[in-house]
Amino acid sequence: MRIEARIFELLTVFFIIVGVVYGFFTAQSRTGVEWAGTTAIVLTAGLSLIIGTYFRFVARRLDLRPEDYEDAEIVDGAGDLGFFSPGSFWPILLAGAGSVAALGLAFFEPWLIAVGVICVIAAAAGLVFEYHLGPEKH
């Protein structure tokens, strides 16, 4: 987690520098500082700082991972990484439901937003509980 914390802390510094440069150069224009972009960049710096700080605190509590060693090999991280369901159709349904909800937001159609959100909730529940059904359901 130390590497991830360092990445996000460097991103914070980058976004602060970009925010200052962006604010300076937009202030030189005839319309003055463009506040929407400047605010967005500064808030992005704040969000990356939050994530970097979280990763830094988590890294203190966890043991070193193979990725944290300077002389680590690929083989050091080998092993079981978890369960993957290769035949699941729920991610496709979740993506389709998210697309419907996004279209509803884009065109501001409340009925389409409602249908999309309901479908997202149903597809997310199906994805989470896919293997939590009883044995008679399979």
UniProtKB/Swiss-Prot annotation:
Q: Which parts of the chain span the membrane according to its record?
A: 7-27, 35-55, 81-101, 102-122
Its recorded name reads Probable cytochrome c oxidase polypeptide 4
Which superkingdom heads the taxonomic lineage of this protein's source? Bacteria
Record family assignment: Belongs to the cytochrome c oxidase bacterial subunit CtaF family.
Q: Example GO molecular function term?
A: cytochrome-c oxidase activity
Subunit record text: Associates with subunits I, II and III to form cytochrome c oxidase.
Q: Which organism is it from?
A: Nocardia farcinica (strain IFM 10152)
Predominant location category: membrane
The Gene Ontology biological process annotation of the record reads:
electron transport chain
According to its UniProt record, where is this protein located?
Cell membrane
Keywords of the record, alphabetical order, are: Cell membrane, Membrane, Translocase, Transmembrane, Transmembrane helix
Judged by the first EC level, this protein's enzyme class is translocase
The protein's job, in short, is: Part of cytochrome c oxidase, its function is unknown.
The protein's Enzyme Commission number? 7.1.1.9
- Mention any one GO cellular component term assigned to this protein in its UniProt record: plasma membrane
Q: How does it sit in the membrane?
A: Multi-pass membrane protein
Chemical reaction(s) catalysed:
4 Fe(II)-[cytochrome c] + O2 + 8 H(+)(in) = 4 Fe(III)-[cytochrome c] + 2 H2O + 4 H(+)(out)
